């Protein structure tokens, strides 16, 4: 049975919701799944003034956690077309794991959220995936077997590189059922891939 970590950072709760959907998909494929978040690095007064969602149920991950999983699915929102600094700061601490090759051959995947349709979803996914490739991980995206990402009847997230959602500039849009279905599908694919590689 594959052991999967869904590792995320969420400012306003959109990625927390997506992370839980990713985990549902991985569990449905038979994996053992943990959902953990990275530490908030913004000062408390800044986070509170900006109404960050600070009461998230997931425990905070440590770098030492990462090597104990067969697959790691990383989610972070965009910041100007790239990975949010909180996740970047966390992954930047993984040099020791990289040096030892501790993540080589493990399965990796990415998911994200942006405020708008053209707010950097794919570039943010690539910035996450770049880290995972440097760690030596095998990448699983979100193929068009998730047909919801091809919808033209409504605004939807999703890309071949990973599950996505849109939050709107004021955070008012929550992940749609199509967005969540994409997240579940990606979680399922990661779990199935890890099971093939690790049993």
UniProtKB/Swiss-Prot annotation:
The keyword NAD applies. Transmembrane segments: none annotated. It catalyses: a quinone + NADH + H(+) = a quinol + NAD(+); a quinone + NADPH + H(+) = a quinol + NADP(+). PANTHER family: FLAVODOXIN-RELATED PROTEIN WRBA-RELATED, FLAVOPROTEIN-LIKE PROTEIN YCP4-RELATED. HAMAP family: NQOR. SUPFAM superfamilies: Flavoproteins (SSF52218). Residues 4-190 form the Flavodoxin-like domain. Its EC number is 1.6.5.2. One of its GO terms (cellular component) is membrane. This is NAD(P)H dehydrogenase (quinone). Keywords: Flavoprotein, FMN, NAD, NADP, Nucleotide-binding, Oxidoreductase. InterPro entries: Flavodoxin/NO_synth (IPR008254), Flavoprotein-like_sf (IPR029039), Flavoprotein_WrbA-like (IPR010089), FMN_Rdtase-like_dom (IPR005025), NQO (IPR037513). NAD(+) binds at residue 12. It comes from the Bacteria. Belongs to the WrbA family. GO terms for molecular function: flavin adenine dinucleotide binding; FMN binding; NAD binding; NADH:ubiquinone reductase (non-electrogenic) activity; NADP binding; NADPH dehydrogenase (quinone) activity. The keyword NADP applies.
